[in-house]
From Swiss-Prot:
Record comment regarding domains: A Gly-cisPro motif from one monomer fits into the active site of the other monomer to allow specific chiral rejection of L-amino acids.
Enzyme type, top EC level: hydrolase
Keywords: Cytoplasm, Hydrolase, RNA-binding, tRNA-binding
Stated family: Belongs to the DTD family.
CDD domains xref list: Dtyr_deacylase (cd00563)
Alphabetical GO biological process terms: D-amino acid catabolic process
Enzyme Commission no: 3.1.1.96
Record carries keyword Cytoplasm: yes
Subunit and partners: Homodimer.
NCBIfam families: D-aminoacyl-tRNA deacylase (TIGR00256)
The protein's name in its UniProt record: D-aminoacyl-tRNA deacylase
Role summary: An aminoacyl-tRNA editing enzyme that deacylates mischarged D-aminoacyl-tRNAs. Also deacylates mischarged glycyl-tRNA(Ala), protecting cells against glycine mischarging by AlaRS. Acts via tRNA-based rather than protein-based catalysis; rejects L-amino acids rather than detecting D-amino acids in the active site. By recycling D-aminoacyl-tRNA to D-amino acids and free tRNA molecules, this enzyme counteracts the toxicity associated with the formation of D-aminoacyl-tRNA entities in vivo and helps enforce protein L-homochirality.
Record organism: Ruminiclostridium cellulolyticum (strain ATCC 35319 / DSM 5812 / JCM 6584 / H10) (Clostridium cellulolyticum)
């Protein structure tokens, strides 16, 4: 499971000119599910994201987590995070999870975050989405549950 995590002041995802999800201060997460992913990946990544200390404390040091600040989460599915661009000029997506399995894992990830008490909004799985991100910092991190990077 891979994630692009961005600290945001606000973020909105729109599908067919209708807002599907919108948050204030928190994290915008583009989430990709891989073929080999399972519940262990959900546990690892959800815990890592909710507890990353990337929000500033009173001294301006990145020392607070999403949970610490009562921040919100916007999760958008993004299978292209598993795009392999090493050969040729067109990415290959062989390592991306099959849609029916990926959707289930994506939904379980979202539910895990909600169960932790985080207000969590989402896009629509497999939809063509427009994502507006007001990146704060900017702070952007790449995470991989298999720790490939």
């Amino acid at each position: 499971m891979r994630a692009v995590v961005q600290r945001v002041k606000k973020s909105t995802v729109t599908v067919n000119d209708k807002v599907a999800g919108s948050i204030g201060q928190g994290l915008m997460v583009l989430l990709g599910v891989g073929r080999e992913d399972d519940d262990r990946d959900i546990e690892y990544l959800s815990d890592k994201i909710m507890n990353l200390r990337i929000f500033e404390d009173e001294n301006g040091k990145m020392n607070k987590s999403l949970l610490d600040i009562g921040g919100q989460l916007l999760v958008v599915s993004q299978f292209t995070l598993f795009g392999d661009c090493r050969k040729g000029r067109r990415p290959g997506f062989d390592k991306a999870g099959k849609p029916e399995i990926a959707k289930e894992l994506y939904e379980r990830f979202v539910n895990k975050c909600r169960e932790a008490g985080v207000l969590t909004e989402t896009g629509i799985f497999q939809a063509d989405m427009l994502v507006d991100i007001s990146n704060d910092g900017p702070v952007t991190l790449l995470l991989d549950s298999k720790k490939e990077f």
